[in-house]
């Protein structure tokens, strides 16, 4: 297990869960079976690769949420490595969770157990195509990379021109750090092989979209009701990836 554990979901504050569910289902995402851990209204959609958690509660949103079964041990290790927590709940009588901000203010949370049933292995891609990255806007990619390196040491790709972009594995999900001025918020990226099908769904359902938004050659940007941005591309803008392990002992990793 990595220092972060396993990626669970892209969590986002959702004022109207039914409206957001409708948006994702029209694009071909599947609703997942949730547990009873959260007291607030909650739903999850997935394409088999990325899960989006819709939360009817106010928090620092969106958040990258990971599951780590030994949060107490992980929290001690992270604290020893200089991490500061925005919240920390560790007790035998509560659902254990913690949160912190990365160097650019993006929210990361860790919880002790799953909150929904995993997607079936045969869950099909959505009309957006194959998910390939969560992209985070950063001021300085190399500086942000130094923050993330102890938590996610497996580098997939680094591109220096025209803008610096780094991709690595964060708890088994591809995470990108981008200096592109066109990227305004944490966003989801997909490689779409059927543009016509996606365009038809956008037109048929009146989905909020913007053609050629200027981010890495995406041919369309979709805006979900709760604010999640989804980009569709003809190709992965970094091409083929390979994995390089840059750390032998990240904090909190299990031996």
Where do the PLM segments sit?
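Surface loops and adjacent helix of pleckstrin homology
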Residues: 34, 57, 111-113, 180, ...
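Short, flexible, glycine/charge-rich loop motifs used to bind or transfer phosphoryl groups or to couple energy/partner
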Residues: 1, 54-55, 124, 178-179
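Short, isolated positions in well-ordered beta-strands
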Residues: 52, 174-175, 230
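Vicinal oxygen chelate
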Residues: 6-15, 44, 56-130, 136, 156-162, 167-169, ...
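Alpha-helix boundary/interfacial micro-motifs
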Residues: 33, 45, 65, 120-121, ...
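Core segments of cupin and vicinal oxygen chelate
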Residues: 1-50, 135-173
């Amino acid at each position: 297990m990595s220092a972060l554990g396993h990626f669970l979901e892209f969590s986002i504050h959702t004022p109207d869960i039914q409206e957001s569910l409708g948006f994702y289902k029209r694009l071909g995402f599947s609703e997942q079976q949730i547990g009873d851990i959260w007291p607030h209204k909650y739903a999850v959609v997935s394409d088999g690769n990325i899960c989006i958690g819709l939360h009817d509660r106010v928090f620092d949103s969106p958040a990258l949420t990971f599951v780590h079964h030994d949060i107490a041990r992980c929290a001690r290790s992270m604290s020893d490595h200089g991490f500061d927590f925005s919240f920390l709940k560790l007790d035998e009588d509560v659902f254990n969770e913690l949160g912190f901000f990365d160097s650019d203010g993006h929210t990361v949370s860790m919880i002790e157990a799953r909150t929904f049933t995993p997607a079936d292995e045969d869950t099909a891609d959505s009309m957006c195509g194959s998910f390939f990255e969560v992209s985070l806007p950063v001021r300085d990619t190399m500086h942000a990379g130094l923050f993330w390196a102890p938590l996610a040491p497996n580098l997939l790709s680094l591109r220096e021109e025209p803008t610096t972009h780094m991709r690595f594995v964060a708890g088994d999900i591809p995470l990108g750090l981008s200096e592109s001025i066109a990227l305004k918020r944490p966003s989801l990226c997909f490689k779409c092989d059927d543009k016509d099908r996606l365009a038809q769904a956008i037109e048929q359902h009146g989905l909020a979209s913007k053609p050629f938004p200027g981010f890495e050659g995406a041919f369309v940007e979709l805006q979900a009701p709760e604010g999640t941005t989804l980009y569709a591309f003809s190709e992965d803008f970094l091409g083929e990836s390979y994995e390089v392990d840059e750390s032998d002992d990240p904090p909190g990793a299990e031996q």
